[in-house]
């Protein structure tokens, strides 16, 4: 009976959708969202729970494939917002509204710790401390990615380029013509576990990469740069269905209250770096 009430919460069990905030996520993107036992936890979950407290509503977090998050929030039939380490892009902004950005990330590459070929390509970025490899160093490799993520988008862009040669906005791509390919997986950890039989390396955002490598010492990771000064910078935000102004304002209020220090504290908490 409990399971039935959970599935049909909108029409039964005495609670309406107005009493809750339904949040869709993909719970395989630690430290932002991940399973702890049967519970979904993470930075985004902590943020949304604070939003629920502000609005006096219960927050319900549900897991789904990453690729359906934007569309599910856009149609507004069930989910009020999406919190999944979502990168703000122009195409996504056409479909949903985004909160203020709360975290800046770059793309990373994960490889086997005993991959001497990759280790030989390691460099130090212009800041003097960031370990990196260049996109061009991935020539000829099979790049594993989580489907529909920005890692997937960037990998496709660098392999296939954009526009037509001769056009003013033409971009060849760092890996175009090198024999590099993309292989998609349902989540980053599945992709990582496929190294080296299914793919050579995995392209994923910074903190999920460092989290995975901290828990699995047979892998290492490095930032992906174009040259010593230029990385693939992107910003995370929470998305809501267009027109949900009250919810969007509450999310922005919470993000403002947390500030950079508060977000950093949540990140450290879920990376196990507290204390």
Q: What name fits each language-model region?
A:
Residues 17-86, 183-185, 205:
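Extracytoplasmic small-molecule ligand-binding "clamshell" domains
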Residues 26-27, 103-111, 206, 210-255, ...:
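Periplasmic-binding protein-like
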Residues 32-46, 117-123, 136, 173:
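Short, solvent-exposed loop/beta-turn-alpha elements that line the ligand-binding surface or hinge
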Residues 51, 73-74, 138, 192-196, ...:
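Hydrophobic residues within well-ordered alpha-helices
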Residues 58, 125-140, 145-172, 176-182, ...:
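Ligand-binding clefts/hinges and TM-proximal coupling segments of bilobed small-molecule sensing domains
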Residues 58-137, 223-231:
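Acidic, polar ligand-binding/catalytic clefts
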Residues 67-71, 85-95, 154-157, 161-163, ...:
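A ligand-binding cleft/hinge motif common to bilobed small-molecule-binding domains
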Residues 5-19:
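Sec-dependent signal peptide cleavage junction
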């Amino acid at each position: 009976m409990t399971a039935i009430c959970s599935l049909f919460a909108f029409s039964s069990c005495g609670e309406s959708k107005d009493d809750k905030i339904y949040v869709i996520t993909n719970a395989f993107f630690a430290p932002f969202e991940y399973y702890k036992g049967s519970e979904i936890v993470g930075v985004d979950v902590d943020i949304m729970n604070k939003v629920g407290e502000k609005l006096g509503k219960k927050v319900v977090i549900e897991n789904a494939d990453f690729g359906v998050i934007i569309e599910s929030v856009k149609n507004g039939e069930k989910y009020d917002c999406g919190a999944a380490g979502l990168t703000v892009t122009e195409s996504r902004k056409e479909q949903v509204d985004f909160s203020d950005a709360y975290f800046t990330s770059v793309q990373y590459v994960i490889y086997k710790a005993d991959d001497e070929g990759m280790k030989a390509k390691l460099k130090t970025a212009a800041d003097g401390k960031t370990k990196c490899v260049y996109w061009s160093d991935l020539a000829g490799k099979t790049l594993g990615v989580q489907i529909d993520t920005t890692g997937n988008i960037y990998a496709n862009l660098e392999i296939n380029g954009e526009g037509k040669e001769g056009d003013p906005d033409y971009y060849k791509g760092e890996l175009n013509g090198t024999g590099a390919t993309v292989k998609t997986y349902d989540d980053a950890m599945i992709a990582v576990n496929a190294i080296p039989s299914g793919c050579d390396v995995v392209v994923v955002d910074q903190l999920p990469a460092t989290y995975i490598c901290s828990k699995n010492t047979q892998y290492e990771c490095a930032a992906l740069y174009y040259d010593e000064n230029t990385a693939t910078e992107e910003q995370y935000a929470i998305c809501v269905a267009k027109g949900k102004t009250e919810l969007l304002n509450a999310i922005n209020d919470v993000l403002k209250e947390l500030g950079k220090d508060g977000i950093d504290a949540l990140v450290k908490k879920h990376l196990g770096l507290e204390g």
